[in-house]
UniProtKB/Swiss-Prot annotation:
It comes from the Bacteria. This is 3-deoxy-manno-octulosonate cytidylyltransferase 2. The gene is kdsB2. It is found in: Cytoplasm. GO terms for biological process: CMP-keto-3-deoxy-D-manno-octulosonic acid biosynthetic process; lipopolysaccharide biosynthetic process. It comes from Burkholderia ambifaria (strain MC40-6). One of its GO terms (molecular function) is 3-deoxy-manno-octulosonate cytidylyltransferase activity. One of its GO terms (cellular component) is cytosol. HAMAP family: KdsB.
């Protein structure tokens, strides 16, 4: 089982909710012969071969697929509003110590780079006072600042999050930033990986959603609302987008068919 240098055990939870308005049965969508959740699990296992990995599910149809492949899973409440709450239930029911680290990897990201997962696990391990951790990369194209589906984050001089928003932050009062500003490290795009101590995860799950979280539909704002620091790891570029719609499925399948990838990072 993976542990940090200070002895803290590392668990990885992959939340997988069957119901999806835009793509019902999303975890089981076929991606070149394998259900998506199986591909996500394989990617995490390849990145962190010694980690304690649990898929947090809410439907017997997912359980059947995972059980047939010998993949560890935990059935969770169907009423959870977020993957954070689903991960918290797994940690609580499993009796993990408060000091253990829990990495939350989204179940709809079948192409998340193994190098990113490894780097993030290392980042969490190197953060002595780990509370909440996440990832961001340069926005790249300045036009993406205006895309509400792209979540932006502003950090302080320590690399801790000041705010997350679907709006353009920081706002440039004197007009649109130059195209080169997209790579200067000031305009950052959030990448939805999370790490916590179990104590922090449980505190987040127990807290009621805050007004900012409900307004922006961004669960990480709950941590900031509660005064919890969020340490942000920098990554050089955005990973391939996840799956939310049938069009996304077609895009990922096309990538898998074309096999335009580094041989060390098979899709």
């Amino acid at each position: 089982m993976t542990s940090f240098n200070d002895g803290r055990t590392v668990h990885v939870v992959i939340p997988a909710r069957y119901g999806s308005t835009r793509l019902p049965g999303k975890p089981l969508v076929d991606l070149e012969g394998e259900p998506m959740i199986v591909r996500v699990h394989a990617r995490v296992r390849r990145a962190l071969p010694e980690a304690d990995i649990v898929v947090a599910i809410d439907d017997a149809r997912i359980a059947e697929v995972l059980d047939a492949r010998g993949i560890r899973f935990a059935m969770t409440d169907t009423g959870h509003a977020s993957g954070t709450d689903r991960a918290a239930e797994v940690a609580r029911v499993s009796g993990w110590p408060d000091t253990d680290a829990v990495l939350n990897v989204q179940g709809d990201e079948p192409l998340v780079p193994t190098a990113l997962l490894q780097a993030f696990a290392g980042f969490c391990g190197a953060t002595a006072a780990l509370g909440v951790a996440t990832v961001a990369c340069p926005i790249g194209e300045v036009a993406l600042l205006d895309e509400p589906a792209i979540v932006k984050v502003v950090v302080d001089h320590r690399g801790r999050a000041l705010y997350f928003s679907r709006a353009a932050i920081p706002f440039c009062r004197d007009g649109r930033p130059a195209d080169s500003a997209g790579s200067n490290g000031l305009f950052l795009r959030h990448i939805g990986l999370y790490g916590y101590t179990n104590a922090t995860l449980q505190a987040l799950s127990r807290a009621a959603p805050c007004e900012l979280e409900q307004l922006e539909k961004l669960e990480q704002l709950r941590a900031l609302w509660l005064g919890m620091p969020i340490d942000v790891m920098r990554w050089p570029d955005a990973p391939p987008a996840g799956i939310d719609t049938p069009d996304d499925v077609a895009r990922v399948v096309s990538l898998l068919k074309r096999q335009t990838h580094d041989a060390t990072e098979p899709y």
